[in-house]
Amino acid sequence: MKDYKNYIFDLYGTLVEIHTEEGEDELWKKLSFFYGFYGAVYEPEELQESYLALVASEKNSYAHEAYPEIELEYVFQKLFEKKGVQADMELAVHAGQFFRILSMEYVKLYDGVKEMLELLHKKGKKVYLLSNAQEIFTTYELRYLGLIPYFDDIFISSSCQCKKPDIKFYKMLLEKHQLKIEDCVMIGNDNTTDIAGAKELGMDSLYIHSNLSPELTGEPDSTYYMEEMDMKKLMEML
C-alpha cells in the first residue's frame, strides 16, 4: 500500500461496530412516555408513524441534493410541536438521544482500532473522519468510545447536509485542510458510498469487508481490498 499523508476513515462498520433496532414496539412505547412527560401525548404507534412521516418530509425538502442528509434533531422537535408543545433544541436533542439509546443493542470499537490510529499518528500522518451519520448521535458515541482525540478533524454528514458518495462531502474536508487528492486515501466498508465517492473524486481507497458491510457483488471499486475486518493486517498495510 502506498504511503499517504492523510487517512480518511468511515466510522460505522469500519472503526465502530454497532447494532440498532428502531422498529421495536417497546422503543416507541418508552419514547411515547418521554414525549408525554413534556405534554406531547402520543400512542406508541402514532408516534412511530409521525416520526417516519416527518423524516420523509425532511428528506423531500432536500430533494435538490443528489444525496441529501437531514438533521434529525428537527424531526424530534417537530414531534413536540405537532402536539402543541414548544420545545427548545436542547430538549429535542435529548429526545433524539433517548431514542438512539433505546434502539441500541451495542456500540463498540473493533479490536485494535485505537492502536491502529495511534500508529498513524506516530508516523506523522493526519487522520480524519468522514461519516454518514447524525451529529446528535455520533458526536456523543465518539466521546463514549474515546475516539475524538484520535482525529485531526471530524466531518459528520448531518451537519454538512450531504453525504457519501456525494463528492461535495469529500471536498469540504479537502478544501478546509488544503489537502491534495493524491496524498489521501479513503478507508471504508461500503462500496456504494465510501468507495464510490472516492473513485468519482479520483481518490485512492481501501475497502474493508466487515460484518456491517452491505452485500457485495463482484469486486469492490477500491484501490485496495481487505476481505474481512482484521485490524492487525490493516496495521501491517499502513
Regions found by a protein language model. Give the residues of each.
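A metal-dependent, Asp-based hydrolase signature
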Residues: 32, 45-97
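A generic alpha-helix surface/boundary motif
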Residues: 29, 70-74, 136, 168
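Charged, low-complexity surface patches
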Residues: 24, 69, 109, 131, ...
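Asp-based, Mg2+/Mn2+-dependent phosphohydrolase catalytic module
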Residues: 1-7, 17-21, 38-45, 90, ...
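Short, acidic loop-to-helix structural element flanking the phosphoryl-transfer center
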Residues: 66-74, 82, 88-89, 98-128, ...
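Basic, amphipathic juxtamembrane/active-site segments
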Residues: 22-35
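Short glycine-rich His-centered loop
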Residues: 8, 16-17, 53-58
